[in-house]
Every structure is written in structure tokens, then in C-alpha cells.
Amino acid sequence: MYWTLVKIGLIRKRLRTFLTIMSMFIAFALYGTLNTVSSIFTGAIEGTSAENIIVMPRYDMFGKLPYSHVQFIETLDGVEDFMVMDYLISDGLESMMDGVVYATSPNFFDVYDRFEASDESILALKTNPNAAIVGQLMADQKGLKIGDIIYTKANSLNTDGSYNWSFEVAGFYTAKQIKGDEMGAVINWDTFDEARMNQKGTIGMIMIKAQSAEEGEIISQKIDERFMNSSYATRSGPESMMAVEMAGEIADVELIVNSFW
């Protein structure tokens, strides 16, 4: 995997490596593989939708937004559906490379429909507080099966006073086009937020499914204008555009990608 190449080049600076790779992961996760990242610069973006709008902190990629932002989003015309997401980020570099745990709304698979999961696993996500739907690629690499327990040591403090988290594999998700997107696990944001001791009531991003690309542009503008002067200003736009902007803030990603070929 390409993360191995990144690790070899940066392993001596572990803190810088962690921050750099996590920054790139957030941007690249919207596309999954280096081939797709490269296609950003040719205009041939696979698996993305102009109707999917990302809302995230304006000035800090790793910042948080209050969950209360969704109250305004719910009132906007043209919003077909939306979901919230946060990240359970592993402290250790090695475990981070194994995948990221996404804490999301249970309707994740309705809004982000380039991912698919069975009805049974989605029901478990809603009813079992410890349930996790694991990416098929990660499950295959680790030999995971339904009922297995996965463990991670993360940056969020658990109610037991530790940074240790565990989840039960309730099913598997697949990506319609980009298999690299299957390196992760999805858990229920509500139960995660209830269990963590810090940063309660916050989210990393909001994804909106707009009724059309045109409606999406209007929605993005209204959201950013609404929170422009608040302590939690937003940056909103189509997922493809947001990924390009995030990648551009980190480095010349096209140069990085092409250097591996």
C-alpha cells in the first residue's frame, strides 16, 4: 500500500509523520487510491457526486463543529438528507495505518451511497452501541468475521478513564468503485459521543445530500454565510472540490503521486 512508502520516507519524524499522513488521509479518503487522487488533476474524478456537500471547520482541518449546526441545515430548501461524522484517531502511527474509525449518523449509507452495507448490519449499527461495520478490504486483510472484537487506542477519552476503545464487528461495507475506501470502520456517532469524556456534542464534518448540484451550491453559500462571524465558521462545497482544496493545503499532491509511478 502507498502508506508504506510514505512511512519509509518519514518514519524518523514520528509526530510530523502522524500529522502529515492524517492530513493526507482525510483528503484522500474521499477518493480511496492514488489513481483517483491523480485523476483530480485531470478532471476525471471517480466515485464522487456533485450533489454531496461537505461542511467542515473553515480554519482548521482537524477542528470541530458543534452538532447544533445541523439545526440550521435542517431548515434549508434543497437538502434531501444529511449525516454527521467524526473521527476516532489512533494515537500510535502503526495502528493509524490499519484504518480509521468513522463515527457517523446511522443513515451514513443512505447519504454516502457509493458505499454499501447489508440491512442487517445497518440495523445493528442503530441498535447495538458497540457495533462496527468494517470495510471489506480491511476485514480481508485482518481476517475479521462477524462477532469479532476490534480494539484501538485513540485520542478520545473513554468513560472508563482510558483511551482504549473496542467494537464488535456487525457486518462489512463495500465501495462501489474504489476499493481503497474499504480501509476503515463505521460506528454510531450517538453512542460514541455519549461514551467519550471530551469534545462531547462536536463533529468533524457534515455531509449533505442535495437535491441537485445547483441546489448544493446555494446550500453551501447559505451555510458559510450563516456561520461566517461565529467561533465555528464553516467551509462548504462539493466533496471533490473540498478534497482538492485540502490536498492543496498540504503539498503538491500531484507531484507526490507521480513520484511513485
What are these regions (language model features)?
Residues 99-142, 146-149:
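Short beta-strand boundary microenvironments
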Residues 114, 133, 139-237:
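Basic-flanked hydrophobic alpha-helices used for secretion and membrane insertion
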Residues 1-31, 35, 247:
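N-terminal Sec/SRP start-transfer signal
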Residues 25-100, 123-127, 140, 221, ...:
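Hydrophobic, regular-secondary-structure patches
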Residues 97-103, 249-253:
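Short, surface-exposed amphipathic charged segments that create phosphate/polyanion-binding patches used
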Residues 37, 41-44, 216-261:
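Peri-transmembrane interface segments
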